[in-house]
Amino acid sequence: LDHVLGNIQSLMLAKKAGVDCRILDAYNRIRIIDGETILKKKEQYGTYVSLIPLTTEVAGVELTGFKYPLTNYTFTSTGSASLGVSNEITENIAEICMKSGTFVLIESRDEPLKA
C-alpha cells in the first residue's frame, strides 16, 4: 500500500508539471484528473470507474453517462469518498466535470487484461 500511495503522489507531481501520466496494471488504469474528463465506453479499461478525492474538497461535480449520475455534488476527503467508488459507464460517452479540486480516477476490471 505504501508504494501505491507514493506512486499516486508521483502522478500528482506529473500532473502539476503538465505531463499526462498513468499507472497501469492487468486490473487498473489510474490517473489524476481535474476540470473535465470524457470517457468513451468502447475505450474503457474495465467495468468500474472510481473517483477518489485527492484534494480536501472536489466541488461542483457533475457525472453524466454513469449508472450513478451526480449534479453539482461536493466530495470531501473526510466524508463522502466512498460515494465515488465502483460507478459504471452506461452511455457511449461518460463525462466527469468539476469546478474545483482533483480526483484520482481509477478504471478497474475483475478479470486481468489478456496480453
PLM features: what roles do these ranges have?
Residues 1-40:
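Anionic-ligand-binding alpha/beta catalytic cores of soluble enzymes and soluble regulatory domains
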Residues 26-28, 33-115:
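Long, charged alpha-helical interface segments
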